[in-house]
Amino acid sequence: MANGVSEMRLDWGSVRTRDGVKPDAAVLDVFVTSEDIDTVYDAYCRIEHAAFYNRDLEEAALPLTSALIEMVCSGRCTHWGLHWVTDALYEISLGQTAPWEAEAGGTGVADRCRSIIRDNLPRLYQTAGSITDDYTLASLVSITGVTDPDENRWNTFTQKLLDHDPGPDTAREIEDTRAWRTRNGGPAYEGCSWD
C-alpha cells in the first residue's frame, strides 16, 4: 500500500450509476494503491463507466469527487494512482450532468461536483506544490482553471509554476486554460461553452 493507505471505499449501492452498474466497493483502494499501470487503468475504467463516462456525470460522481480529492491531497496514491486520479478529476471538472440523471432528479450534478472541487482548492494548490510529474501537474492546472472563480489566485498559482520552468504539458495547459478562461469569462458552469 502507498504511504500507509487505509481502505478508500465508496458505497456505490447508495447512489445512481450509469446503467445501474455498481463497481466493487474496493475499486478505489486498487485505484490508489496498485503499482501496476494496467491494474490502475482497469480500476479507472470501472469507475469512469459508473460515474462519469463521456463526461456525463452520474449521481455517483458527487461522493467520488470528494474521494478523489482526498486521494490526491493526502499523498495516498502510487505514481500511477495519482496520474489516473487527477485524470478522473479533470474529466469530472469538465463534465456535464447526464441527461438521464437530470430526469431522475439529479439536476446540477456537474456544478455540484465543481463546487466540491472549488471548496478544496486551497488543498489542491498546496498539493500541486509537491508534484513533479508534468502530466499530473498539467491536469491540476486544468482542474483548478475551470473551477477557481478567483482570477488573482489562479494566475498567482500558474505564474509560480511558470517561474519554475514547468514541463511542456504544464506550460501548454497554462496557456490553453488562460485563453479558455478569457473566452469563457471565468470558471466553468453548467452549459458553458468548451470551445
Language-model-detected regions and their locations in the chain:
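Boundary/linker elements of alpha-helical solenoid repeat scaffolds
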Residues: 3-16, 45-56, 99-111
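Alpha-helical solenoid scaffolds in eukaryotic proteins
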Residues: 21-30, 63-71, 88, 119-126, ...
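Short sequence/structural elements of tandem HEAT/ARM alpha-solenoid repeats
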Residues: 59-68, 101-105, 115-119, 152-160
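Glycine-rich, aromatic-bearing surface loops/beta-hairpins
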Residues: 153-195
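HEAT-repeat alpha-solenoid elements in large eukaryotic scaffold proteins
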Residues: 37-49, 89, 96-98
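Conserved hydrophobic register position within alpha-solenoid helical repeats
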Residues: 42-44, 81-85, 136-141, 171-174, ...
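Residue-level signature of the C-terminal ends
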Residues: 50-54, 71, 75, 92-99, ...
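N-terminal "cap/leader" segments of large eukaryotic alpha-helical scaffolds
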Residues: 1-38
